[in-house]
Amino acid sequence: KLKADAGIMVTASHNPPADNGYKVYLGGRIATGPAEGVQLISPADAEIAEAIAAAPHADEIPLSAANVENVDTRADYLDRAAQLVGESSDVTIALTAMHGVGAALGKELLTRCGFRVSLVPEQAQPDPDFPTVSFPNPEEPGALDLGIRHAEEIGADILIAYDPDADRCAAAVPTASGSWHQFTGDETGALLGDYLARRGATGNFANSLVSSRLLGRIAAHYGLGH
């Protein structure tokens, strides 16, 4: 939308506190067609890492304010995401961002869509030390323990957990036996695909190479491309 040459994100992601991640996405002038918007991989990522290592410290690099423009895309994102959700049901959501950046925006979006949302209080504020989890990946065993406890306390229908930069998501729901079932990424993707297909989605489904082939079978069942 902004016609940028590239998008760059500096993030701890779901890694240990001492690590920083650096992600680069290609813009339309660098790559067109299917490659536009993709994340850089090897060998370009290694070349960027070498350039970073060779650069001086940040406080030694002169900056030009003339080439910097702050752009807030949150309103556009919320509008578009709310359109995709459509009508909500009577659902209470426990939400955790694992001490990352997704809490406020996630709660605003889900509340706007008509859901009741309660943040896990101990993990609601951004904290680069991730004090309540040793490894803030919501897909890891044990990472959702605090969130599940909060979900039980408020009687939530579902727990949704983001990793610290909010590009990874996990979900868990209570079972009839009183325990909680945490969905794998493949299970979540299959459920979302089936949900969209049942609602009359058109176009093609796609998944990564490391994902289950189940989404492809769902697409074939509904006559959709994959």
Question: What is each residue range found by the language model?
Answer:
Residues 1-30, 216:
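Ferredoxin-reductase
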Residues 3-4, 154-156, 201-202:
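Short, high-confidence coil segments that cap the C-terminus of an alpha-helix
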Residues 7-11, 25-27, 94-98, 120-123, ...:
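Generic beta-strand/beta-sheet core signal
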Residues 20-151:
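Gly/Ser/Thr-enriched, mixed-charge loops and adjacent short helices
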Residues 43-44, 50-74, 175-226:
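Proline/glycine-rich low-complexity loops and linkers
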Residues 103-106, 117, 143-148, 152-171, ...:
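Extended, hydrophobic alpha-helical segments in both membrane/secreted and soluble proteins
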